[in-house]
């Protein structure tokens, strides 16, 4: 009995040890990717914030009717969802999907979805939610190429009045252990008081380059979402893998203790049997 128990525990120890090697390696890889993602995030955030200020000044000077400010009359809402291509990142993806479900459940008929990432596509398919477009295999460091493709699709859907409002759903990165799902409305734009901008003069007129400005702003916004999403994903994965490694260490400690106790019990039993046999032969 003891021998069979020892073999079973030894197998479990080997299995948990192999799993620990995997989780530890994935944790180290995620740490390295997170470091790179944070650098990229800081660079993109500065560009995005500067562009946002410029766009605000430009929009406040548009006096003519414009669908990007006044709306296009459509009641459809578009949600662009940023998820990951890979799993094993804790609750990163499910938190985003749950926020989307809560947002669209009361108005499903007027809610349209574009999903970014394999995991988001998989979850939405299971839930029976159709998508207008899907973007997968996004690189660890997203570029303007990916952002431009998505921005052009958004502009096309909005300018053709297929959608009347556009929201970006992504995870904002604060630290490796803190991320928050945000739902940001990006179209139509909101005008603010332009009293502070009366000294600004645009040449050529704003209306001649508003489309180009809009596309560049959307690219900057989407790139900012990508950067936050990648940092959040790797932060969540690093935390999840480090937690899994710690759990594996605790389990190995318990298994080692069980193994040693069982082996000690087996040795004691063998000694007792030997002594008992010797006594019987006297």
UniProtKB/Swiss-Prot annotation:
GO MF entries: ATP binding; proton-transporting ATP synthase activity, rotational mechanism
Chief location category: membrane
GO biological process, any: proton motive force-driven plasma membrane ATP synthesis
Signal sequence bounds: none
Compartment(s) where it occurs, according to its Swiss-Prot or TrEMBL record: Cell membrane
Record's keyword terms, sorted: ATP synthesis, Cell membrane, CF(1), Hydrogen ion transport, Ion transport, Membrane, Transport
Matching Pfam families: ATP-synt
Classification via InterPro entries: ATP_synth_F1_ATPase_gsu, ATP_synth_F1_gsu, ATP_synth_F1_gsu_CS
Gene Ontology cellular component terms for the protein in this record: plasma membrane; proton-transporting ATP synthase complex
Membrane topology according to the record: Peripheral membrane protein
Assembly behavior: F-type ATPases have 2 components, CF(1) - the catalytic core - and CF(0) - the membrane proton channel. CF(1) has five subunits: alpha(3), beta(3), gamma(1), delta(1), epsilon(1). CF(0) has three main subunits: a, b and c.
Record HAMAP family: ATP_synth_gamma_bact
Role summary: Produces ATP from ADP in the presence of a proton gradient across the membrane. The gamma chain is believed to be important in regulating ATPase activity and the flow of protons through the CF(0) complex.
Similarity-based family: Belongs to the ATPase gamma chain family.
NCBIfam families, alphabetized: ATPsyn_F1gamma
Protein name: ATP synthase gamma chain
Organism in which the protein naturally occurs: Clostridium botulinum (strain Okra / Type B1)
């Amino acid at each position: 009995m003891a021998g069979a128990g020892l073999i079973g525990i030894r197998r479990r120890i080997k299995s948990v040890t192999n799993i620990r090697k995997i989780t530890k390696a994935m944790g180290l890889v995620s740490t390295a990717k997170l470091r790179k993602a944070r650098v990229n995030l800081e660079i993109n955030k500065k560009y995005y914030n500067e562009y946002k200020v410029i766009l605000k000044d430009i929009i406040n000077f548009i006096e003519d009717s414009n669908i990007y400010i006044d709306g296009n009359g459509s009641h459809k809402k578009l949600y662009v969802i940023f998820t990951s291509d890979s799993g094993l990142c804790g609750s990163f993806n499910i938190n985003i999907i749950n926020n989307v479900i809560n947002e669209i459940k009361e108005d499903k008929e007027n809610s349209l979805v574009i999903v970014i990432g394999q995991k988001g596509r998989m979850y939405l398919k299971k839930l029976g939610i159709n998508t207008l477009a899907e973007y997968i295999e996004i690189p660890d460091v997203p570029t303007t190429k990916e952002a431009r493709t998505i921005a052009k699709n958004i502009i096309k859907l909005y300018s053709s009045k297929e959608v009347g409002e556009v929201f970006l759903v992504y995870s904002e990165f604060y630290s490796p252990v803190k991320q928050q799902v945000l739902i940001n409305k990006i179209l139509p734009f909101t005008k603010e008081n332009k009293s502070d901008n009366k000294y600004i003069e645009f040449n050529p007129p704003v209306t001649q380059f508003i489309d180009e400005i809009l596309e560049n702003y959307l690219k900057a916004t989407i790139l900012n979402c990508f950067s936050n999403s990648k940092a959040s994903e790797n932060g969540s994965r690093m935390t999840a893998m480090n937690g899994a490694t710690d759990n594996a260490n605790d389990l190995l400690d318990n298994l080692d203790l069980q193994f040693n106790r069982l082996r000690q019990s087996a040795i004691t039993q063998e000694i007792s049997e030997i002594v008992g046999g010797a006594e019987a032969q006297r």
